[in-house]
Amino acid sequence: MVAPGFLANPEVRRWLKGVEPAWTMLEFNSLNALRQEPSGSNKAIRLEPDLADGEISGSAVTENALILLRRAAETGGLKLTATGNLSRAVVEEMCGVIKAPGYNKAELLRVQKVINEPDVLPLHFVRILAQAAKLVRTHRAKLIPTPLGRRLLAAEQHEPLQALLFHVAFWRMNLAYFDGYRFLAPK
């Protein structure tokens, strides 16, 4: 599923470091099916809705979504700024409890005096994802759990959370928002 000679190009071979990507072996229809949203008719990707807690705990995003949901439920809502981000006090508190492999809070504090939510990408991503998944919503300058979020917090309802978050992240959100580049429309 690549242009003839593409993989023979020395620049491409150097960039790939000798690895031939699996997608190059796909036919056009197979590649297209993988790019489409999972559904009853498109079974190229199947999202497992009944994972065990041990399997869920392996996902930092799912664990952090549960932490965010619990904090919002336990505190009567998480305080938001006028722009809709979590307040600095909430960000400081959440930085101590979220799981963020490879994220170095000390390094961030070294270059910034104050930390806003967008500065902590693992937290910012999870908050936006939880809102896009309709697990939380804003109400009177607070982030509160929705009925769906409260149901998922019930001990026996964690199973579908990872599938829901994966589905929303890859088929409902614009992940380009997180790349740091503003979209420039042609003039």
Regions found by a protein language model. Give the residues of each.
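Accessory beta->alpha helical hairpin/"wing" motif in late/C-terminal subdomains of nucleic-acid enzymes
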Residues: 124-126, 133, 137-184
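Short, amphipathic alpha-helical interface elements at domain boundaries
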Residues: 2-125, 148-151
